[in-house]
Design a protein with these regions (language model features):
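Conserved structural motif at the start of ABC-family nucleotide-binding domains
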Residues: 2, 17-19
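The feature captures the beta-strand-to-loop junction immediately N-terminal to the Walker
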Residues: 33-35
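Helix-to-loop junction immediately C-terminal to a conserved catalytic motif
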Residues: 48
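Conserved ABC transporter NBD signature motif
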Residues: 56-71, 213
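A short, proline-enriched helix->beta-strand linker immediately N-terminal to the Walker B motif
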Residues: 148-152
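Catalytic Walker B motif of ABC-type/P-loop ATPase nucleotide-binding domains
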Residues: 154-158
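Helical segment within the ABC ATPase nucleotide-binding domain
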Residues: 169-181
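H-loop/switch region of ABC-family ATPase nucleotide-binding domains
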Residues: 189-191
Length: 235
């Protein structure tokens, strides 16, 4: 589904991402982990064609993302608050997304229903603009907006940030569910190793822009190796 070949990004003479070859199959749930500056967000931005690669390419379903816009019709993503439209209410924002993806109002209501617990009655019906919500609720709105389009490909950058523990557990379950039930290809970056290990089928460890480990994660098997790399002592 996603193919990366000789992908390189350079900022001010410094190579911040350099991945020779990476293939992600349809239906995989891939966790990106690494310390700050490892290149996780840069990789996601390149997959979404938000920044230009200095070398190499990214393909989605066989087409280069910088040469075709077909992938946009089946891709959902949330990187940060700049993806939101601050002067809209949540209802208006989700309706806007529905218009972009051809989702009618009734279908949109059905797709929002599984997120009711996640929203904690703090988002819909509040008559607030997105700019007036807390960081946590803005994060929720952005994630929901990416998922309600029922994408074939879903990319989320640090989806557990700003969320309370119950919301973190809730969204982890929903991400795993969408992958399992719809065969969605999911790529998430996170510093939360436990959640990544709990839901990911595969974990990619980046260091200074390079892919240094590609770990299969059957039954959470990768967590021990990740803990060793990050210097986390087992209890």
């Amino acid at each position: 589904m996603i193919k990366i070949q000789n992908l390189k990004k350079i900022y001010n003479g410094t190579t911040v991402l350099d991945i020779e070859n990476l293939d992600i199959a349809q239906g995989e749930l891939v966790g990106l982990v690494g310390n700050n500056g490892a290149g996780k967000t840069t990789l996601l931005r390149l997959v979404l064609d938000l920044i230009k690669a200095d070398d190499g390419f990214v393909e989605s379903d066989g087409k280069k993302v910088n040469e075709s816009e077909d992938w946009k019709t089946y891709t959902g993503s949330y990187i940060d608050g700049r993806f939101l439209v601050d002067f809209l209410t949540p209802e208006e924002y989700f309706s806007f997304i529905g218009d972009l993806y051809g989702i009618d109002d009734e279908t949109m209501k059905e797709r929002l229903a599984p997120f009711e617990t996640f929203m904690h009655d703090e988002i819909m019906g509040t008559k607030k603009y997105l700019r007036d919500f807390s960081q946590g609720n803005r994060q929720k709105i952005g994630i929901i907006g990416a998922m309600i389009v029922n994408p074939k490909v879903l990319l989320l950058d640090e989806p557990f940030n700003y969320l309370d523990p119950s919301s973190q557990m809730n969204i982890a379950r929903l991400i795993h569910q969408v992958c399992k039930e719809h065969g969605t290809t999911v790529i998430i970056s996170s510093h939360n190793l436990n959640f990544v290990a709990d839901i990911s089928s595969r974990i990619l460890l980046l260091e200074k822009g390079r892919l240094i480990k590609d770990l299969q994660n059957t039954d959470g098997a990768a967590i021990a190796e990740l803990n060793e790399y990050f210097g986390i002592q087992a209890e």
